[in-house]
Design a protein with these regions (language model features):
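Residue-level preference for long, well-ordered alpha-helices that form the structural scaffold
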Residues: 30, 34, 73, 131-132
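Alpha-helical packing segments of well-folded alpha/beta enzyme cores
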Residues: 37, 41, 80, 138-140
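Short, solvent-exposed secondary-structure boundary motifs
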Residues: 86, 130-134
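Alpha-helical membrane-targeting segments
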Residues: 30, 175-176
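Short beta-strand edge/turn micro-motifs at domain boundaries
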Residues: 1-12, 107, 111, 133-175
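Short, surface-exposed loop/helix-turn segments at secondary-structure junctions
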Residues: 122-131
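A solvent-exposed, acidic/Ser-Thr-rich amphipathic alpha-helical stretch
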Residues: 44, 49-120
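Short, low-complexity N-terminal intrinsically disordered segments enriched in polar/charged residues
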Residues: 2-55, 59
C-alpha cells in the first residue's frame, strides 16, 4: 500500500494527533452508569488488570474484534486485549467519549471511543517490536444482560480500530 501510494514520503499518512482537525463536537459523552462502567473496565484492562474480564464479562459473551475475529467468553477477551496491550506496553490509554443508554424493552448499552498512544515496544498482536510511535483510535460498544443471579454482565462486545493504519505506522517507521 505504501509503495502503491508513492512511497513513505508521498503516501497517505495514517490519522494521528499531529494531523487531527478539531470538529464542531467536543463533548465527552453522558453521565449514564453503563458508559462509565464500560470506560472503567477498559481503563482497568489497559492497566493490565485482566482479572476484570472474568468479573465484568458474561461467561458466554459474544465478542467481535478487528480483523473479522468472532470469539467468545473470558479467553477470547483476554487474548484480544492482552495482544493489543502487549504490543504497546507503555502506551497511554485515554477514554475520549463514553455514553450509556437505558431504554424500555432494550438491554443496557454503552459505547466508548478511546485512544492508545505510544511506542510499539512489545511482542503482541503486532509482532516483533519496532519502536514505532503508534496512535490507535478505537471504539468499543457493549450490551449488558442479567444473569440468573441478577448481576448484569457484558454479554456482547464490538471493538473496532483501523488495523491497516496501525500496521502502516509500524511499516513507515521501519522504512525511515
Amino acid at each position: 500500500m505504501i509503495a502503491r501510494e508513492g512511497g513513505p514520503d508521498a503516501c497517505v499518512k495514517p490519522y494521528t494527533p499531529a494531523n487531527d482537525v478539531t470538529g464542531p463536537y467536543t463533548g465527552t459523552g453522558n453521565e449514564n452508569v453503563w458508559g462509565k462502567r464500560l470506560a472503567s473496565m477498559l481503563e482497568k484492562i489497559m492497566q493490565a488488570e485482566f482479572d476484570v474480564i472474568s468479573q465484568e464479562y458474561n461467561r458466554a459473551a459474544q465478542l467481535e474484534y478487528p480483523g473479522g475475529v468472532n470469539t467468545w467468553s473470558f479467553e477470547g477477551a483476554d487474548q484480544f486485549w492482552m495482544g493489543l496491550r502487549a504490543s504497546f506496553p507503555n502506551a497511554i490509554f485515554k477514554v475520549r467519549h463514553a455514553i450509556g443508554r437505558d431504554d424500555p424493552a432494550m438491554p443496557p448499552r454503552a459505547a466508548v471511543r478511546w485512544t492508545l498512544s505510544g511506542r510499539h515496544e512489545g511482542y503482541g498482536a503486532f509482532g516483533e517490536p519496532t519502536g514505532a510511535e503508534v496512535f490507535v483510535l478505537g471504539a468499543t460498544h457493549a450490551e449488558y444482560g442479567e444473569l440468573i443471579s441478577g448481576a448484569p454482565k457484558l454479554r456482547r462486545e464490538w471493538t473496532l480500530y483501523d488495523e491497516t493504519a496501525v500496521w502502516k505506522q509500524i511499516l513507515l517507521h521501519k522504512e525511515i
